[in-house]
């Protein structure tokens, strides 16, 4: 493999054995692609905004004399960029402008004659835009729209598993689910009649809907039944024989062939042998006894030809009298329905008997009564209602997916068709459910991923947009009918409010629009790849059963079987598997390698769950020889959702990668294959809660996916084009682009601005640091700057810690963790948290609030950190209770005492009519002010601090733009100089000229002269561009802010808090091994090895066997080896060994392992590259052990040997306090530990004096309300059991809700009198009131 310059800085040793056929696809593509389909113009009009417009327009007036047509749309440019939107708290969106055409038709002339056409561009609200990382900025906060897994539109057949009826009989049902519109259900009742429901309302006989579709009784019978024909002879009946229909029945008469030989005797069962005999003798007719026809059902009406009287009506049972009547009337042929109990039930016939309607109108009225109970039905209303239910494109749409699923399920070859239902569709569904009831077909599995599809952002936004458009449509139609159309323009007809309201509501408050989890890069990526079954149109937590939550065979390679939340949402929220993607219909597909005649090819096909069922698919870990031929005869495969063994020749596909089945978070767990699934689930979930540490540390034992994840998450800065680094500082990186990657006529400079110390959604710190230096070559995709939780472009969520598995004085009992003081001293788990505190000055009824340093009754010391505007300085170190922003609020007039009046008269007005309402630091917080922002309403004078901040921003913007301009200008001058030197000018002569003079030289060579002129033009453009950009920036900075009504000014203060690790913080490994720190032990007390190196963390060995996450033990061994190798390299560097020896050792390390795929050609590295690699490996050689394809036990032992460590992975340890050796060897090694965002600082809390609940007068609960600890029912029992009567009395009265008692107690304590007089608790009064509300009067009498 060829490594780029920056990849050679540190190479991760990979133990993977399988070749990488397919790279992991871009991780955020599910979000970006979906939204791109929504906003991009689609000429076919099948998706996105275009589809929404085409489905609603043209809008015709009621009279048909005018219509509003849609022409095209375009999205404008957003006003603010993403960062500005986050600072100002506004939505990152672009205005949508739509070109509409109003057509007026001439009433007098022929229909369709156009009288007037007006075209105009109309503003239709703002559409939120997606940032390049797949998020939306809504009101200044980053949000993610989670994809939804919902039931695909189409038709589904199911049964109730015998739960509905007490007899346990299985009742079948069919449901037609459209994309939008009414649901249509068919269901059997226990008596085997078929019923229909519309929108889950009251059920009707299914034949009613057929009558409403204009089928007569006979048509209905013909659709669902075959006929049996009888001929009436003189004294007998002859039945037309269809031999197959007799199989399995018991003969009720002797069956004879044409010659009169008895083939089946009366009472015998008819078998296949008898049927073959009948077929052999060519018997086409059978003579049956006359009684045989009794009870059979007539297939049509039989009418007396003379009188016109109906002798037997269709669907009536024929009796012997009826037979005599028919015979008398001269009717010789009788057709009956062919039914039997086994596989041709008389369901529709029974249903018709229940059905009271006889014609179409009655059926329509019946449906109308069911849909609109209580309204008087008229013929037109009933017709219109039925028509609108399933046959109107405005009200009903199956969608492309729905039609495809519908047709495939009913065996119709064509995947295309209309979005509405047809008569034939409804009949086909009824025929299919009867076929299933007859046992000739199977029901569907609704948890199969072929029956559930993904709805992503774009589709959901389009649906919301359509909802808004439909609301507008009604208003437009009315205005077209009422207004004077000659005066009106399209703009006057359209009101954009309903559209933007619908879109805003979706992005702001939909269940699927979620506050982005921004703890670390992994949590961002997994949040964007989350698939939820909840949300509008989905399931609800309470109603979801076990089956929906369970892992289904079709999840293989599509949804991760491991990563799902614990708790009530388990199985309802899933994560996309690493290689999965959605197809054009919204079904999940996963890639497979094609196998032909037992040989694996490099062709990769994506298969959906439905397609996958047809093939035989082998796993990724099968043995293959050098030619790609399968070695073994019997191969473990999957076929139709089952695991089986097949011959190599029968295999059609094979997995692309062993990591195919798991999600990104799960594939970050090394040795995942050795962990129990429950613990792996916790491991995958807890990695998302890791807080970015101060100094990121790459994992020594990784899985090789760390770099992909860090780059795809967008937190690192990756090079867009190759070149070399021209300039680096803490906030920007400049890359000079390679000549061959330039677009003609550009300066060839890429500038990357870095994000510095900004706050994330979870209050963690987002900061980017450059990891390249000037002059380094870069190629496209190289990492230039690290973000939070990344180290040289690798995801680094935690720290590598030296751990020992041993008990230590009970300090690691029950998963507690003992850590060394060194960990805290070295700031290994120190994290920075940034809090945003805001102070709002409003207009009140009594006057406006004011932000000022002049605060009544506050001493000088409290104001020491404020400037003259009353706002805290940047850099001030503050603690709980300090004032950050001074603010005073007008107080209502109070009655003054004569003394106050006198003082007022002497010293003038305005002394005490304001109260202090300043913003103070919350009690438990201590930190440094890192930024202050002031937002002032338009038209309100800016204070001094606001002007200073503004000037600073303008100066910064000017500096940035000037530097950018200088760099670009330098690029132009450099190219001009090269051009002139090429044309024969002397270098010294050119260097003596002022730079701009280079562009006005003349060259004889014409092509070069034009090139120079082009550069001069480019220079002018750069200047103009600079002025324009600066003007835009300046205007944005100085313009007033759009604040909420009644708000004059907002001051936001950003406070950085540094949190070191301390007892009570939660830590975890990557294998679901979590615990709370119990003690920070002095370094000298920690166990140490023979070389005197103490361990950092002591974990309890009992946490491993019962939890079955053995992966952590293997990780510890491999981590020890990796660190040991790093130590060997450090020693070599310190002893200044020969470079050849160092190169040889590093080469040996990278070559270790059996048939490993990774090839690192250390020999091709220059000496400088080897040295730099060695320096980066001093802390340990990073290794990768991919899931299901990782390091083997032998390889770990070989690594330990190379590191000069015992291959058992165990060391002798000594007790730090006594110096005695522990009695047995201890497993010591390196494990990657994470500090989780469950910090004791955020949870610990103690109440002093606080607020009380209004009704019960008891203290509130919870840290946010500064609440108390509830002394609950069980605690009361405990005190009762101890007989601690006085303590109990105190708890229930003065310490809780005896209002008078507690105030009295406060007074007593102040006076030094330590006595209490308990009174009546308020909650007892509440109880009395509640009893009285039940109508029982209780009064307390004093004795």
UniProtKB/Swiss-Prot annotation:
Signal peptide: none annotated. One of its GO terms (molecular function) is DNA binding. It is an enzyme of class 2 (transferase). Keywords: DNA-directed RNA polymerase, Nucleotidyltransferase, Transcription, Transferase. The keyword Nucleotidyltransferase applies. GO terms for biological process: DNA-templated transcription. It catalyses: RNA(n) + a ribonucleoside 5'-triphosphate = RNA(n+1) + diphosphate. Its EC number is 2.7.7.6. DNA-dependent RNA polymerase catalyzes the transcription of DNA into RNA using the four ribonucleoside triphosphates as substrates. The RNAP catalytic core consists of 2 alpha, 1 beta, 1 beta' and 1 omega subunit. When a sigma factor is associated with the core the holoenzyme is formed, which can initiate transcription. Belongs to the RNA polymerase beta chain family. This is DNA-directed RNA polymerase subunit beta.
